[in-house]
From Swiss-Prot:
Annotated protein name in UniProt: Capsid protein
GO molecular function terms attached to this record: structural molecule activity
Keyword set, alphabetical order: Capsid protein, T=3 icosahedral capsid protein, Virion
Described purpose of this protein according to its UniProt entry: Self-assembles to form a T=3 icosahedral capsid composed of 180 copies of the capsid protein. The capsid encapsulates the single-stranded RNA genome.
InterPro entries: Tymo_coat (IPR000574), Viral_coat (IPR029053)
Signal listed as a keyword: no
Any one GO cellular component localisation term in the record: T=3 icosahedral viral capsid
Similarity section: Belongs to the tymoviruses capsid protein family.
Amino acid sequence: MATNHVLASQLPVNTKSSEIPLQSGTPPPTIIYPFQIEMASLGTADASDSISIASNSLLASVTTLYRHAKLTSLKATIHPTGQAPAFPTTVALAWVPYNSTATSAQILSVYGGQMFCIGGSINSLSPIDVPCNLTNVNPIIKDSVTYSDTPKLLLYSIAQETAPTLATCSVTITGTLTLHSPLLQATA
């Protein structure tokens, strides 16, 4: 079943993360790892969260056997459920660097922050994609050093006064990681 997605790009900021060039010679073999993680089910109550991609436990378990991990794509998607037409839900999202002091309550004050009404009789029930512009943040989530400007998703949701017991929408984070340089460990 094909679904139309609404693309809601966050405006870019002209910044570049600092990248130390790899040593000369043959680049190490890499593995491209696609992932999708459900981060929140919304609509049953008001919610706010600040989600660090680099410290996500599911991604940490994937990267544990490698010394280096870099995001090559990243997006948040809002998926409406069957409850959405009867119970519209407000959802606000913004991608920021981890060291940003912006909070979930300040999303519309963040450059590129966006708010959506999910559901209702007039609004679209198509999934909404909010891609992370990886030039605004540092895409390296695992390295020999820890970075403080990796991607963070700010999320804020307002439910109806008479909220349903089932979620009206879910938020997932989808992307691809490039992994390289196995971490040498004992096998026994």
